[in-house]
Amino acid sequence: MAIKKYKPTTNGCRNMSVSAFSEITTQTPEKRLLVSHKDQAGRNNQGKITVRHRGGGVKRKYRLIDFKRNKDNIVGKVATIEYDPNRSANIALIHYLDGEKRYILAPKGLTVGMQIVSGKEADIKVANCLPLMNIPVGTTVHNIELKPGKGGQIARSAGSFCQIISREDKYVLLRLQSGEVRKVLGTCRATIGEIGNESYKLINYGKAGKKRFLGIRPTVRGSAMNPNDHPHGGGEGRAPIGRKSPMTPWGKKARGVKTRDRKKASNALIIRRRTK
């Protein structure tokens, strides 16, 4: 993906960059694969904020993505590569020989006209989907299932991938980009290749207003709040936080405390913890 940089003609354009959308082949999505999507603004079913700094933003339609890739042994042809406002990766519209149309995540190297297929006997080429046990060691994969038939859960964002490093009985060992090494059942499916749009992380939005279009609200420092709103709040002028260590808004230590549940079932499947 190419990045388009702007000249500093205004303060908002200074250092701003956007995607050049050179890979996008159409601006009109498939209408039958769109559903309405109401933004929850970070609230749960009780109306309480569970994710801070969310709200507003432009209205979007949700694209139904085929994460399961369970249409076995039916060849599909790539019709379009499209922009998806709900994720960092691009998506591809697939026309199958039986007439069905589905969206999939667009991997790097996928172009209009290519043919893809899912199934145990599928070839090892970009965008084909197979069980992990049928994929050679050393192959990079994305959209990886953690439970057979549930659909891909790992490596779905722009530029993401995992590498198969070995096999152990009914498990396959994957190395994630974070450095974590994890066991996954060999019957779980994965798609060959890495997600495209890998330059997404280089985009500079240039001004706060573009973040507001995405539904991201400002992050206020705790020291700028009142003491009833944050442990760092209060004091005269620019006062220090007045604590031995930084605190979360709920009064817990914000640094050096492990947040993962010790009794989480998947702990047994993690061979090496992430390094970053």
From Swiss-Prot:
Keywords: Ribonucleoprotein, Ribosomal protein, RNA-binding, rRNA-binding. Residues 252-276 have a biased composition (Basic residues). PROSITE patterns: RIBOSOMAL_L2. The keyword rRNA-binding applies. SMART domains: Ribosomal_L2 (SM01383), Ribosomal_L2_C (SM01382). Disulfide bonds: none annotated. One of its GO terms (biological process) is cytoplasmic translation. Residues 221-276 are annotated as: Disordered. GO terms for cellular component: large ribosomal subunit. Coiled coil: none annotated. The keyword Transit peptide does not apply. GO terms for molecular function: rRNA binding; structural constituent of ribosome; transferase activity. Pfam families: Ribosomal_L2, Ribosomal_L2_C. InterPro entries: NA-bd_OB-fold, Rib_uL2_dom2, Ribosomal_uL2, Ribosomal_uL2_bac/org-type, Ribosomal_uL2_C, Ribosomal_uL2_CS, Ribosomal_uL2_dom3, Ribosomal_uL2_RNA-bd_dom. One of the primary rRNA binding proteins. Required for association of the 30S and 50S subunits to form the 70S ribosome, for tRNA binding and peptide bond formation. It has been suggested to have peptidyltransferase activity; this is somewhat controversial. Makes several contacts with the 16S rRNA in the 70S ribosome. Part of the 50S ribosomal subunit. Forms a bridge to the 30S subunit in the 70S ribosome. HAMAP family: Ribosomal_uL2_B. Belongs to the universal ribosomal protein uL2 family. This is Large ribosomal subunit protein uL2. It comes from Onion yellows phytoplasma (strain OY-M).
